[in-house]
Amino acid sequence: YGLFVCLLLWGGSELCCPQPLWFWQGGTRQPAPSVTPVVVECLEARLVVTVSRDLFGTGKLIQEADLSLGPEGCEPQASTDAVVRFEVGLHECGNSVQVTDDSLVYSSFLLHDPRPAGNLSILRTNRAEVPIECRYPRQGNVSSRAILPTWVPFWTTVLSEERLVFSLRLMEENWSREKMSPTFHLGDTAHLQAEVRTGSHPPLLLFVDRCVATPTRDQSGSPYHTIVDLHGCLVDGLSDGASKFKAPRPKPDVLQFMVAVFHFANDSRHTVYITCHLRVIPAQQAPDRLNKACSFNQSSSSWAPVEGSADICECCGNGDCDLIAGSPMNQNHAARSSLRSRRHVTEEADVTVGPLIFLGKAGDPAGTEGLASAAQATLVLGLRMATIVFLAVAAVVLGLTRGRHAASHPRSASQ
């Protein structure tokens, strides 16, 4: 009798008995079927709730019209004789979202609000509210799409894209290490290595877009000599076959090239600075007329790329490589000034190596004079810098001495 009253009041067995109810069927004692009444699926951007029509496990099936989802009371999308199904967006039906230290929590509820059937004024099931919650990690990937193998979260990848470090270095003849001495004789070949440090960035392919040589660090100064132009054409190779790109590359983010040593006529400084505009593209992108590394072969009078099809170098001969502007790029002062005026973005940068000191031919007295002149200029610059540093240190020491002297001999109020 007590169990019967409890069932009428609460409409369920779990509140009335500490153990599951057992019933008799066909003369044998069997446990009630253990069917999960509510199944929740938390998808990438949607919420799926499947409700058993035997919601209370009593054998009394609920009506589809008595079920709703969320504060806005969304109706079911599908139903069968056994289940009722909801499928909504995470932000729909008035669902709430909460941000914790490590999760995004979407909360909603399933409401069963029975109505009297027909003209009857009685209910055989109770009103019930089932809380629903979906948790998503804030530092993970919840997409069903494949993850690109950067192996870092998206925000880290974005930061690493802003930290590309471009460099241009003078190397030994065997490319094994950086050349420590900046001196050359006429007839030598300078070995230059352009490189970009990519960090956690996806693989990149580096190109030397343009290079210009000047006697000072001012890349727009005069006189000047163009080494690379037209988006990767090593035009210095037209006058000396030793000037060319090295193929194949050691790595996609490294590009090496040789330049036959020269000096500027009627210039007593015997120094040269080389400024190059470097740029990168995704490694999977094929080289084209705007992204290439082409050398001139004097024996065959033709241009050849380090990689890519041969036709991308054809424009080096006729000068129409600049597809964006729609016109050939002239080797003039304006073209060299664009090295400095172009916007510095993460995919490109200007880098300078120098000064390279040229001594003339080996054993040439004129070369010794040039070395003495260059060394004298370097010595004068060093002495000036040392004098400035000495004066600055002396001023700081003098100020500290005066401060300590004043602190150790304070004046009285009467004085």
Swiss-Prot record:
It is a single-pass type I membrane protein. This is Zona pellucida sperm-binding protein 3. It comes from Oryctolagus cuniculus. Residues 1-18 form the signal peptide. Glycans are attached at T28, N119, N141, T150, T156, T157, N174, N266, N297. Residues 19-378 are extracellular. The gene is ZP3. The ZP domain is involved in the polymerization of the ZP proteins to form the zona pellucida. Coiled coil: none annotated. Its main location: membrane. Residues 41-301 form the ZP domain. The keyword Coiled coil does not apply. Polymers of ZP2 and ZP3 organized into long filaments cross-linked by ZP1 homodimers. Interacts with ZP1 and ZP2. Belongs to the ZP domain family. ZPC subfamily. The chain crosses the membrane at residues 379-399. GO terms for molecular function: acrosin binding; carbohydrate binding; receptor ligand activity; structural constituent of egg coat. Residues 342-415 form a propeptide.
